[in-house]
A protein has these predicted regions:
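Short, highly charged low-complexity linear segments
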Residues: 2-4, 131, 346-350
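Alpha/beta enzyme core
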Residues: 25-30, 63, 75-287, 296-316, ...
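N-terminal amphipathic alpha-helix/helix-capping segment at the start of soluble metabolic enzymes
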Residues: 1-79, 84, 117-126, 274
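Short histidine/acidic/glycine/proline-rich micro-motifs that form metal-
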Residues: 170-172, 292-294, 323-325
């Protein structure tokens, strides 16, 4: 705890002593060593899928806790390889991406069909693979908010992956096509015995209004999580909420006053708790993203995000750029610091 308190600085008391008075923790399905048998056994997931979930939950420094720490490196497509790997060019080589995940103690590594396929025979049995099957590439001009399939569920299965990952840009012009596409892909993945992880991101220029970016609003992101759970995601990945009231500010959708008065407050843990609630009260695990690298503050920022996620009832963190856009030893240190939050029994559910 002492290292976490030191890293949190003047935020320590605010984040570590908060008691959630919105959605009570007793109503949540919280991560535990028995998550698969206590939550997923009751679902329609087949036995091979349960085995894949258990393998993911059982690996790395967080193995057996119910929490996950995943290294995601799909930015070579999403943000261009040059921009992503210029800070540390060793990560142009897929093997170093997988090495960082292994030495960083991660539960799994999430990357592209090409990256993981390049080293699958050497590493698929050493760390769980999550193959990302769709992407938004940055060579089509002008850029459009569309995720297109780069690989198939069968290709992920044949390389020994335990899970497939996909992104839906909720709110974008192509979101309904993406919904039906990924719903079908997730159904097929479950048939083959793989787990499913959905990047539930919002994309619409209208979600920015009066200088406020509502792409990370709790009400909008919570609904995106709910849609992700609806199409069969076992785990949803979401940005940490930074505000609320997106529906009302933009002037669309349906709301209830209690969404903003009783189910959430302006505290980041309560906002994240609202995301957990929308993920079937934690039956579908919520992992928050680490966000872009800002340099010297990355370690403290990552630890703060982990504390918020854990105390809200989330399942873990998926942190990429903060880990790989620096020397490998520093990336390993950052991943371990994130994991230490989930391993610390004194950091409790709010």
């Amino acid at each position: 705890m002492n290292k976490t308190v030191e890293l949190l600085g003047d935020k320590a008391e605010y984040l570590l002593s908060h008691t959630c008075k919105t959605i009570d923790k007793s109503t949540l399905h919280l991560p535990s060593p028995h998550t698969v048998e206590e939550v997923w056994v009751a679902s329609d997931r087949n036995i091979p899928t349960l085995n894949s979930l258990q393998r993911l939950l059982g690996h790395g420094r967080l193995g057996g806790t119910g929490y996950v720490s995943i290294l995601p490196v799909d930015q070579g497509i999403e943000h261009t390889a040059g921009a992503s790997f210029a800070p540390n060019p060793i990560y142009f080589d897929p093997e170093n991406i997988v090495r960082l995940a292994i030495e960083g103690g991660c539960n799994g590594v999430a990357s592209t069909l090409g990256v993981l396929g390049a080293v699958a025979r050497r590493y698929a049995h050493k760390i769980p693979f999550v193959v990302k099957i769709n992407h938004n590439e940055l060579l089509t001009y002008p850029n459009s908010y569309d995720q297109v399939l780069f690989g198939s569920v069968e290709q992920a299965w044949e390389m020994g992956a335990v899970a497939v990952g996909a992104t839906i840009y909720f709110g974008s012009a192509e979101s309904r096509r993406q919904l039906t596409e990924i719903a079908a892909a997730f159904e097929h993945a479950h048939d083959l015995g793989m787990a499913t992880i959905l990047w539930c991101y919002l994309r619409n220029n209208a979600f920015k209004k009066d200088g406020v970016d509502y792409h990370s609003a709790a009400d909008l992101t919570g609904q995106a999580d709910h849609l992700g759970a609806t199409i069969g995601a076992d785990i949803v990945k979401q940005k940490l909420p930074t505000c609320n009231g997106g529906f009302r500010a933009i002037g669309f959708g349906k709301t209830d006053d209690k969404m903003y008065t009783e189910l959430a407050s302006d505290h980041p843990i309560d906002l994240c708790r609202y995301q957990v609630a929308n993920s079937y009260m934690g039956r579908v695990g919520l992992i928050n993203s680490g966000g872009e690298s800002h340099g010297a503050s990355d370690l403290a920022d990552a630890v703060a995000t982990a504390v918020i996620n854990k105390r809200a009832g989330g399942m873990g963190l998926i942190s990429g750029r903060k880990a790989f856009q620096r020397p490998m030893n520093e990336g390993i240190e950052l991943l371990h610091a994130i994991q230490d939050v989930y391993l610390d029994p004194s950091i409790t559910i709010a």
